[in-house]
Amino acid sequence: MTELTRRNTMKLMSAALVAGVSFSSLPRKAFSAGTITVLNWQGYGTDEAWSVKAFTEKTGIAVVHDYYSSESEMLTKLRTNPGAYDLVVLNAARCAQAVAEDLLQPIDFSKVPNAATVDENLRSNPNFSKDGKGFAVPWVWGMTSLAIREGMPVPDSYAVLADPAYKGRVAMDDDAIINVAVGALMSGQDINDPKDLAAVTAALKSIKPNVKLLWSTEDQWNKSFAAKEFDLSLFWSGGSVRSKRNSKLPVQFVVPKEGGIGWVDGLGIPASAPNAEGALAFANWMIDPAFYVEWATKVGAPASSNSAALSALPTDDLSRQVHKPEYLKTMGIMSALPDDRREAFNNVWQEVKAFYAE
C-alpha cells in the first residue's frame, strides 16, 4: 500500500472490538509457544486486540508490536536491530529491496497452509521472490483505478479521462507516481518504467479540458463528489468502498482494460528472527478466512490476498464486489523507484499541473 493510502485507510478504520472469534483452521497449541514481535504500521490489522487475544489463546504465542511511520524507517529498523523482530509487514516494492539486502529469510510455505489459496498472481510477483524462493506471504492488496457516478456509461479505458463528454467533470489524484502510471497506461507503457515520458506527459495534458479538481485526501474527494463537482475520477478501491458504505455516495469503481494500478503488502520473516516458527503461525492466521471476514466486516480492511478469504465475505459485501479476483490478472503492481526516476516522474507531474493551471 502506498504510504498516503495506508494512512488514510488506518484513520478511517474503526477501533471495533469483536468478542468470541473462532479460527477453526488453527488447532490449539499447534505451534511452538513463546513470543513474537511484529513490525508494522500502527492500527493496521496485526494489532487488533480481539485477534491477538484469540491467536494467543489458540497457540500460546504472545504477540507484541513495534511500529514504523514510514517504509524507510521500517527498513532502517530491520537493518539496525538484528534479532529484534519475528514478522514484518512490508509493501511489495520494499520487499524486493529488503531481499536484496538479505534482511529477509525464505518462507517455508508448508507451515503456512492458508497460503495454498493465495492468488497466484500475487504469490508469483517478482518483488516477493528471488531464485525461485518466496520471501513474503502476500497479505492484502488494493488499487487505484476509475470511479464514476452511478448511472453513467461504464468506461473500458483510461482514455475516457480525455473524452469531451466529461468536459469539466473529471477529478485527478494529486500524486505524481499515480498520474505518471495513468499516463503510461494511456500511452501503452509500463507503469514502473515508461521509456517515453514525453508520451506520458502528452497523454496527461490531453485531459486538461476535463479537469475540474486535483484532490489529495479522501475527505476532500467525498465532499466534492457529494457536491456533484465531478462525475469521473481516479480513486482508490478501498476508498470507493468506504464512500459507498459509510457516506452513502452513488459511486461505482471500474477497472478498465489496461488494468488497475496496484499495491500489495506482504508478511516477511526477518533473516535474524528469533521465533520464525511462531511468526509463520501468525502469518497463517493473518490470511485465515475467518480472521479476514471479522476484520473486513467489523473493522474495515483492504482486499485479502487469499481468494478463499475474499470468497468467504457475504456476497453483497462491497469490498468483495470491488476487489474481484479477475482484476489481479491485469493489475500492474507498483515497484520501488530509483531516485532519478522518481524525480523524473515528479517533474512530469509538475509540468502537467502547471499546464492545467494556464
List where the protein language model places each region.
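Mature extracytoplasmic/periplasmic domains
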Residues: 270-330
